[in-house]
Regions:
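PRPP-associated nucleotide enzymes
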Residues: 1-147
Length: 147
């Protein structure tokens, strides 16, 4: 009999209750909140800023993927299969046929989008993931006022 513990499981975000509606998720993750608190401190400088931003976005994209993307049931013959025919893992994993696009808005900083893209190409089929780039700049009038 195949292992069934990982079939049809329910994934739940660690969330704070709120009245913003079902499409808003306020994460209650002590690791992410600790990293965010550290990032906000004025004494934190480069290269730690980049490391924290990268780590935070990596965790956020994994959380979003786990909560929002569809799953499919799969069976995997493990490395132990040569020793026993019972060495088959069966469970729900990410649907590898999902398509994804990340948009890099250069004015807002490129690192978050790059982290999302790199994470998605490792979790999904790379040919199903695309990264688009949008370049933006402020426009000022003759007096230097942003318009």
């Amino acid at each position: 009999m195949l292992e069934q513990a990982y079939q049809g499981y329910t994934y739940r975000l660690p969330e704070l209750p709120h009245a913003y509606g079902e499409q808003v998720h306020l994460l209650a993750d002590p690791v992410l909140l600790s990293q965010l608190a550290r990032l906000c401190r004025p004494e934190v400088v480069q290269p730690e800023i980049t490391t924290l931003v990268r780590d935070i976005y990596h965790s956020l994209v994994r959380t979003v993927v786990a909560n929002e993307l569809p799953r499919q049931r799969t069976e995997v013959k493990t490395r132990m299969f040569e020793s026993t025919p019972r060495a088959v893992w069966c469970g729900d994993v990410l649907d590898e046929h999902v398509r994804a696009v990340t948009v890099n808005i250069a004015r807002a900083g490129t690192l978050p989008s790059q982290v999302v893209f790199e994470t998605l190409v490792h979790l999904l089929r790379p040919e199903q993931v695309r990264q688009d780039h949008v370049y933006m700049a402020r426009v000022t009038d003759d007096h230097g006022v942003v318009t």
